[in-house]
Amino acid sequence: MAVGARPTPRRPDVTNHPELDTLPEWPLETIGVLVTTDPTPHAIPVSWPVRAGDRQILISLKSNRGSLARLRERPEVALLILGGGDVALCARGTARVIAEQMPSAEDYVAVRIDIDAIDDHRQSAFAVTKGIQRTVLDDESELRGLRSRVNTLRSWSQNQAAQNQPAQNQPAQGRA
């Protein structure tokens, strides 16, 4: 802290954000901001996070980046999402690598974030209409790779959801 600086007193009425019970839907091209620690915070952009359930998010991370090393060391993370359709949230939870190599993208790992809390940052004074935007500047291979990784994550999410659904038309145990 700077010499002579004093910590700002916290006002009880503004320290807590309302929480959501479940993750909302957001547009495909949403860019999130992943926060990891070492112990200081580090924030990186994450392209196209995939909603994998009410309280799970899947992302792909380049395997040679510091963010992945920090996540492995300290799996408590936060993912800020500002997306079109007035999505403004911070999902806090525990991350873990679920695939060391992604199909057709061996330099990327797949990460699942199990969400403990979803801070709702929407405000009545404004709405998020587009969220963070970025454009691919090199050849189309980067965009094709991103689409492929997201399609893989979505497929894994759908398969997991199907496995967690109770079987239809099956008699309940104990009933004839």
State where each predicted segment sits:
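Binding-site signature for planar aromatic cofactors or substrates
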Residues: 1-176
